[in-house]
From Swiss-Prot:
Native source organism of the sequence: Shouchella clausii (strain KSM-K16) (Alkalihalobacillus clausii)
Family that this chain belongs to: Belongs to the PyrK family.
Binding site for FAD: 54-57, 71-73, 78-79
Lineage, broadest ranks: Bacteria, Bacillati, Bacillota, Bacilli, Bacillales
Keyword tags: 2Fe-2S, Electron transport, FAD, Flavoprotein, Iron, Iron-sulfur, Metal-binding, Pyrimidine biosynthesis, Transport
Protein name per its UniProtKB record: Dihydroorotate dehydrogenase B (NAD(+)), electron transfer subunit
PANTHER family in UniProt: DIHYDROOROTATE DEHYDROGENASE B (NAD(+)), ELECTRON TRANSFER SUBUNIT (PTHR43513), DIHYDROOROTATE DEHYDROGENASE B (NAD(+)), ELECTRON TRANSFER SUBUNIT-RELATED (PTHR43513:SF3)
The encoding gene: pyrK
């Protein structure tokens, strides 16, 4: 899908967990969005002190309403300022960007395991919706730091079985998503995952020979492959071989890039 740029209007902004916000934008640009796993590059406002856009993954798309939903963590100056924006405000958006999850890898009737960690959870929701529509059976394992950080448990339950893990044990299973997968003996035909690098490393080590795809979280400058700020090296490749996470990714087959 060719990238576009335009202005979208904030129609909803809600804190859904500690420092995590659900942002719903509306406008014609949404008609160009369809692939799960892509992201939008959002300019927070027109001030000169925040020139760089913020990459935010797409959590859901409603083409009929021309609305796109994103969930982001207000951790830095830019995202905190975005969290303060009110309904009715217009924001400048570039996107959709990147290569998303390959839906065609999961065939009708196959078992799919979605594994998300923290702010890596949102893009898996729209992916799960599309997979269920295509006839796949979806199980989700979602990891968070603590109960205060948990979001979207109920929406994921509408897709299939859901397992929640918290690092401090305050909600769901104590520990990490990999612990839950082992304890519940969860198996799959295809795995899709997005989350922090340590989680992706653990999944890569375990499922290198399986049908599995990971989405990398990375700071980005331009979002279109021009600045080389989000380069990662190719597994077993030559020294000069690399991938740009913003354009070649953020989704890669497991084992393709060095984490």
């Amino acid at each position: 899908m060719r990238k576009k740029q335009g202005r979208l209007t904030i129609v909803k902004q809600t804190e859904v967990a500690r420092d995590s916000y659900e942002l719903v934008l509306e406008g014609e640009l949404v008609k160009h969005m369809s692939q799960p796993g892509q992201f939008l590059h959002v300019r927070v406002d027109e001030s000169e002190d925040l020139l760089l856009r913020r990459p935010i993954s797409i959590a859901n798309i409603d083409p009929e309403k021309e609305q796109v939903t994103m969930i982001y963590r207000a951790g830095g100056a830019g995202t905190k300022r975005l969290a303060a924006q009110r309904v009715g405000t217009e924001v400048d958006v570039l996107g959709p960007l990147g290569q998303g999850f390959p839906l065609e890898e999961a065939k009708r009737g196959e078992e799919v395991l979605l594994v998300g960690g923290g702010i890596g959870v949102p893009p898996l929701y729209y992916l799960g919706r599309r997979l269920v529509e295509n006839g796949a059976r979806v199980t989700s394992v979602l990891g968070f730091a603590s109960q205060a950080d948990v979001f979207y448990e109920q929406p994921f339950k509408q897709l299939g079985n859901v397992h929640i893990a918290t690092a401090d044990g305050s909600y769901g299973a104590p520990g990490f998503v990999t612990d839950v997968i082992s304890q519940q003996s969860l198996d799959f035909d295809v795995l899709y995952s997005c989350g922090p690098t340590p989680m992706l490393k653990a999944l890569t080590a375990r499922y290198r020979e399986r049908r599995a795809f990971i989405s990398l979280e990375e700071r980005m400058g331009c979002g279109v492959g021009a600045c080389f700020a989000c380069v990662c090296h190719v597994e077993n490749g030559q020294a000069h071989e690399y991938r740009k996470i913003c354009t070649d990714g953020p989704v890669f087959p497991v084992g393709e890039v060095v984490l």
